[in-house]
Amino acid sequence: MAREAKEEKDEVTVCARCHSLRNYGQVKNQVAENLIPDFDFDRLISTRLIRSSGSANASVIVMVVDCVDFDGMFPKRAAKSLFKAMEGIKNDAKISKKFPKLVLVATKVDLLPSQVSPTRLDRWVQHRAKAAGAPKLSKVFLVSAHKDLGVRNLLTFIKELAGPRGNVWVIGAQNAGKSTLINMLAKKEGLKVSKLTEAPIPGTTLGILRIGGILPAKAKMYDTPGLLHPHLMAMRLNRDEQKMVEI
């Protein structure tokens, strides 16, 4: 009886869309899916960063990029939007100490050839990010959520940057692996938080989600919808082919 009560308590209610994605790897209604508007990064993220820069709380941007398709997955428009926003406030002495910090996370490194050294990959990632218009990086992390590589070090660094009351925004192109990474961060903390829906279909996350438990109680982490990028390889695959891609 006690076991049944515990199992019932641990169950998490999900919407029909997430249930379909988790269990069948497909959306429930493709017609309705096509009507969902693209995520407005400039309005919903960049403007918030500008407003929060004047507060006492730190702002951290975790940009997740699939290193297997780095140039295709790098959110250039968002990077340029951040660069423009940060350039506009960096000379303001009142808020320069709380300048948003950008951490770049190159995911799925386990899928690269073994002869690609971490040092060489780190330099290449920084070079490509700068060429794509990214602001100054606080640090680059090479991780694999699937193989549990680099996740603990990333979590420690994010906590240090965010402090006790900071805001952490996890951004990236559609299907870059943001939700998978956040689930691994939660696992590192030994948390029983609601698992974010993971699926090979681009655009799984629809709105900004606050993730509790990973950071200190008064700090906040947000998962954001995947950014649409015209050069994504995944956008050239049909539904059956997308299911064959490792998240």
Where on the chain are the PLM-derived regions?
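Helical mechanochemical/support elements of P-loop NTPase systems and associated helical scaffolds
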Residues: 11-14, 74, 121, 150, ...
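Conserved lysine of the Walker
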Residues: 178
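Conserved Switch II/interswitch segment of TRAFAC-class P-loop GTPases
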Residues: 23-29, 35, 56-79, 103, ...
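Well-ordered, non-membrane alpha-helical segments in soluble/globular domains
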Residues: 40-44, 74-86, 117-125
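Short coil/turn segments at secondary-structure boundaries
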Residues: 28-30, 74-78, 116-119, 154-156, ...
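Helix-rich effector regions associated with P-loop NTPase G domains
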Residues: 1-60, 89-101, 196-247
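Canonical P-loop GTPase G-domain recognition
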Residues: 86-174, 183-199
